[in-house]
Amino acid sequence: MKAEIMAIGTEILLGDIVNTNAQFLAKELANLGIGVYHQSVVGDNSERILEAFDNAFKNCDTIITTGGLGPTKDDLSKELAAKYFNMEMCLREELLCDLEDYFKKNNLEMTENNKKQCYFPKEAIILPNPNGTAPGAILEGENNKRIILLPGPPREMEPMFTNHVVPYLSKFTDSVLVSKILRVFGIGESKMEDLVCDLLDNENPTVAPYAKNIDVILRITAKGKNKEEAEKLISPMEKEIRKRLGDNIYGEGEVTLEEVVGKLLVDKKMTVSTAESCTGGMVASTLINYPGISEVFMEGAVTYSNEAKMKRLGVKKETLEDFGAVSEECAREMAKGIAKNAGTRIGISTTGIAGPGGGTEEKPVGLVYAGLCIDGITKVKKFNFKADRQKVRTRTMMNVLDWLRRELEKID
């Protein structure tokens, strides 16, 4: 089976709404072992939608549409799908009863145009929608071609697909695709690809690197008769990749770096405080996203001015005069100072020039120093980021968290 995902709606075509449905459907179809070779977006235009059906069926046997099932005149999906397969629309009385009950239960007035949502070809397989008013449907045409019509809102589409479409599609597949994602930080996509380049030509499982924000993911995908068989194919490949990338791999699946660091801090009972200048509280804010971090996170200080660095953190006036606020020496004293004053085992500091102004030849925009004081031992790292102000700050925060992760993993 080959499928195309087709979003129908001018609002998506113009970028007014982000098409998150396509990502969800692509992942779910991959899990079923169904190949998706094309995705398309079509506006609310009859001629163009019919043309899109024609083009899609040149390459696939299954079209999955989202959107265009509502009560308004520009909701055209099911009418055009029926026309494409030469099916006649008719009022489905059972759907009308369900719709009237929905409006009564929610104490809403049902306008006449809502009945439009109850018209489907008599041949259609109806997909119930307990989360909204527009049912979905499956229309099966000749030559093993089918159009699966799903509503546009994700909160309606996703459960409909999971509860009704997945069991239907499972009848047509004799294999499954299983993927495992390894999340990587500390090396760029090109460097990582160089380390695993010989593995990228493998066919089953396949290995593919993707840059995502400022970390990188490696997706290992295997096809098997069942999930267990596919996982057995993935296992030796994963071991080889972990051997090559080592502690640059920080997690699996959808886990974030902040979750990994938060868990390490809580599990190891390592109290922490932050003193930030150029990042303006981003490190602290990211850490406290982790549930339960209040057990170990004591304090976050934004010490932007030299005065605040001296008064709040105990940075020496001579240090600022001799080396400046953006220096290894200042970052060191900031990390030690916040750990001491907050009474925490870990103190983190950041100081740098985020831009766009303020840089010099000696200290350019993007120069950042970060300090990490753990149980009285202080280390400093120097970074040079070539990016705009927000990216300099974000990259600083991410690199500091990754550095902290690596240090925490060394502690028993």
UniProtKB/Swiss-Prot annotation:
Pfam families hit by this protein: CinA, CinA_KH, MoCF_biosynth
SUPFAM superfamilies per record: CinA-like, Molybdenum cofactor biosynthesis proteins
Record SMART domains: MoCF_biosynth
InterPro entries, sorted: CinA, CinA-like_C, CinA_C, CinA_KH, Competence-induced_CinA, MoaB/Mog-like_dom_sf, MoaB/Mog_dom
PANTHER family cross-referenced by the UniProt entry: NICOTINAMIDE-NUCLEOTIDE AMIDOHYDROLASE PNCC, NMN AMIDOHYDROLASE-LIKE PROTEIN YFAY
Sequence similarity: Belongs to the CinA family.
HAMAP family: CinA_B
Protein name per Swiss-Prot or TrEMBL: Putative competence-damage inducible protein
Organism of provenance: Clostridium perfringens (strain ATCC 13124 / DSM 756 / JCM 1290 / NCIMB 6125 / NCTC 8237 / Type A)
